[in-house]
Amino acid sequence: MKTWGLCSDEFADTNHWPYQLYVREARRMIGEYVMSQKDIQTELTKADAIGMGSYNSDSHNVQRRPTPDGTAVENEGDMQVPVTPYQIPYRVMLPKRAEAANLLVPVCFSATHVAYSTLRMEPQYMIIGHAAGVAAKLAIETRRAVQDVDVGVLRARLRAQRAVLERP
């Protein structure tokens, strides 16, 4: 803001402030399995993989604070870290069984801040959303809780639909 200000030819009726702020990260479910930094950096393969992720670990500043003299603002927490392609497990979409047996969560899934920083991108949302749709259909067809979906059958259906589940 200090350097560039607001765009002078947009949002004239709101003093040039946008109607809605862009939310990069919101609340997330805490499932039985929480995907974390180790899943995107060291433990890259998963038996229940439903797709691949490869976007950088990308988090903007998490805190801004004034400098000691009060003349500027310092940013903390920026993270831009390249990742090796990693597998996305089906489990990230699963709520705890005691909380819901008929719900898949393809966006506010179970992940830490660091893991979510790479998973929150649209390509991964499309991959996870596709898998959620296939898994939901499979759960309905077999009259099973989403936690009991046969992951082997799910993966076979995803492959048949040309999903990429592992590195070549």
Give the residues covered by each predicted segment.
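Flavin (FAD/FMN)-binding glycine-rich loop and adjacent Rossmann-like elements that form
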Residues: 1-168
